[in-house]
């Protein structure tokens, strides 16, 4: 029998898809059994043309969540993101990037590349590069390395430093998602 929680989650996904949502980002998807995703994603996709993106940090599980879980894309955090960040911070040689795409043979097109998101420190923050310009070659690598999608996080295109004393986490080089907060760089760009 299908667990009651699974049926309720299906109802929630269908509710939002009916409202016009065209994709779901599933935070820490690997903490949910792949059997659930195997059951629910085809049911949602049968009714609506939606995209499913998963946050999965265990590379040994990537193929399982793509092939059995039916996810369209997975965040490439522990591969490309961590490697490009290390290169940008002079902690690793650029040649390490080759190993990223080599390890993803057959699924590279299912990986979502990014340099910033709500979990990671902003490139321009003092905790990362202290300047947005080192992000330019990193973004070129992320965007041009393959045919897979690339994500630009709100404010990244303007060099948002995320260095305000905001939210519960304080001054940590990240932009809060838990409180209403204004990105100074985005606000200034809009008002200019």
Regions found by a protein language model. Name each.
Residues 138:
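Catalytic-loop motifs flanking and including active-site residues across diverse enzymes
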Residues 11-14, 22-111, 128, 132, ...:
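Active-site-proximal helices and loops of the catalytic beta/alpha 8
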Residues 123-127:
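Surface-exposed cleft-lining segments at the edges of enzyme active sites
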Residues 141-159:
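Conserved short secondary-structure transition element at the edge of the structured enzyme core
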